């Protein structure tokens, strides 16, 4: 199946500058294409992942993707999707963020000869102000630029000349890559349509109307409840494991709504059409098994964090469900118990009642602690404690780093042994 037909089946195409021309181009040859990302932070979140999943599909189909990490445009600020001016970053911040994003890109695409990361600072920084105005500014109509959605949406609240010129800079990126690397396709989110078409227009003006330069945008991904995909009550879901642990990442996907899961399987996995159709059927016939959600979580977590991260996430999930926490490693505990109530405790042995009340503050009183212990409601590191005279050794398990306390079936507490 042609890559364009595959993307249409997945619901991943919003607009194309020339559908027939692009389909013909991708059928007959390997195409170089690009997507840009400005280094406004040092990590992508799952919202950023959407266009780069498309880029990855092109790579797997034999094409050559380029990622433009915008060291130049990132110093300016893209007005797309913003209702106010971006705060300008220092060049040191931009460089730090570039390095973080580039590392993530190589993890997703591999150090492959058919994948390239480039920095638009390398060519934009060489253009003088006079050259910019003469060679490029002269080719852009202010009237046309004002009518682009990305600018028009900002006119009431105001837009600086700096951000106003952003679409010219992005157009220069496309022109440079077209000339230097024979890049013929730019992809981006739906809000990038104005910037992308400005680039194809510039190429056609300077290289001729028969120049094969195309644009493709991806729809805004909405959840079944109408809200924007990628946001949670706890904020963004990051690709950086220091910000969002692989377990939390896995849990985000496994907890998706039945109404959304098939759409996400199409967008975020490389499963075949037949396998996705089969999983879609299980959502209808056996939704309680959540097979589609589990497969989604496995596939996306492996793509971003690797196979071992999936194994660890499933170990944590099983341990928390069954209460068998003894099988967990210290690293898995750190991931799985992030966000549960916790406290630092000493490594000294102590009476269990005093430890629960004084050291951890887990129990409100000694009377309550004794009652819970006698009733078998307290488990320490997965083992039931029934003796109120028992002594706890905080350094006895999990490399002497943690003590896991559970009351009843769901109330967990994590003690960090210092």
Curated annotation (Swiss-Prot):
Top EC class of this enzyme: ligase
Domain S4 RNA-binding: 350-418
Protein location: Cytoplasm
GO annotation, biological process: tyrosyl-tRNA aminoacylation
InterPro entries linked to this entry: aa-tRNA-synth_I_CS (IPR001412), aa-tRNA-synth_Ic (IPR002305), Rossmann-like_a/b/a_fold (IPR014729), S4_RNA-bd (IPR002942), S4_RNA-bd_sf (IPR036986), SYY-like_C (IPR054608), Tyr-tRNA-ligase (IPR002307), Tyr-tRNA-ligase_bac-type (IPR024088)
Reaction equations catalysed: tRNA(Tyr) + L-tyrosine + ATP = L-tyrosyl-tRNA(Tyr) + AMP + diphosphate + H(+)
Top-rank taxon, per record: Bacteria
Residues reported in the UniProt entry to bind ATP: 231
Quaternary context: Homodimer.
Protein name, per record: Tyrosine--tRNA ligase
Source organism of the structure: Lactiplantibacillus plantarum (strain ATCC BAA-793 / NCIMB 8826 / WCFS1)
């Amino acid at each position: 199946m042609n890559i364009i037909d595959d993307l249409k089946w997945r619901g991943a195409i919003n607009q194309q500058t020339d559908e027939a021309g692009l389909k013909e181009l991708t059928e007959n040859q390997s195409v170089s294409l690009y997507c840009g990302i400005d280094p406004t932070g040092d990590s992508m979140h799952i919202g950023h992942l959407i266009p780069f999943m498309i880029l990855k599909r092109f790579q797997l189909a034999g094409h050559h993707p380029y990622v433009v990490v915008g060291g130049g445009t990132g110093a300016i600020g893209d007005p797309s999707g913003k209702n106010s001016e971006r705060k300008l970053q220092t060049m040191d911040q931009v460089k730090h963020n570039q390095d973080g994003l580039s590392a993530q890109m190589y993890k997703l695409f591999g150090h492959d000869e058919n994948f390239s990361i480039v920095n638009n600072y390398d060519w934009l920084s060489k253009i003088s102000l006079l050259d910019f105005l003469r060679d490029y500014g002269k080719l852009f109509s202010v009237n046309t630029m004002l009518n682009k959605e990305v600018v028009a949406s900002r006119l009431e609240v105001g837009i600086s000349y700096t951000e106003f010129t952003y679409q010219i800079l992005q157009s220069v990126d496309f022109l440079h890559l077209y000339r230097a690397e024979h890049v013929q396709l730019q992809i981006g989110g739906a809000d990038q349509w104005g910037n992308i078409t400005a680039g194809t227009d510039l190429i056609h003006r300077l290289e001729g109307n028969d120049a094969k330069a195309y644009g493709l945008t991806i729809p805004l991904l909405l959840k079944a409840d109408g809200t924007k995909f990628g946001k949670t009550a706890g904020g963004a879901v990051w690709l950086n494991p220091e910000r969002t642990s692989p377990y939390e990442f896995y849990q985000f996907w496994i907890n998706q709504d039945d109404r959304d899961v098939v759409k996400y399987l199409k967008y975020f996995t490389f499963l075949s059409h037949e396998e996705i159709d089969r999983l879609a059927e299980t959502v209808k016939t056996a939704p309680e098994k959540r097979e589609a959600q589990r497969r989604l979580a496995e596939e996306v977590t492996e793509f971003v964090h690797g196979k071992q991260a999936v194994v660890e996430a499933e170990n944590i999930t099983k341990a928390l469900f069954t209460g068998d926490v003894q099988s967990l490693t210290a690293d898995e505990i750190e991931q799985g118990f992030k966000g549960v109530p916790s406290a630092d405790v000493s490594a000294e042995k102590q009476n269990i009642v005093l430890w629960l009340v004084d050291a951890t503050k887990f129990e409100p009183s000694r009377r309550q602690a004794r009652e819970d212990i006698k009733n078998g409601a307290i488990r320490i590191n997965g083992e039931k404690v029934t003796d109120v005279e028992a002594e706890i050794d905080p350094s006895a398990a999990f490399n002497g780093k943690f003590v896991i306390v559970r009351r009843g079936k769901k109330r967990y507490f994590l003690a960090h042994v210092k």
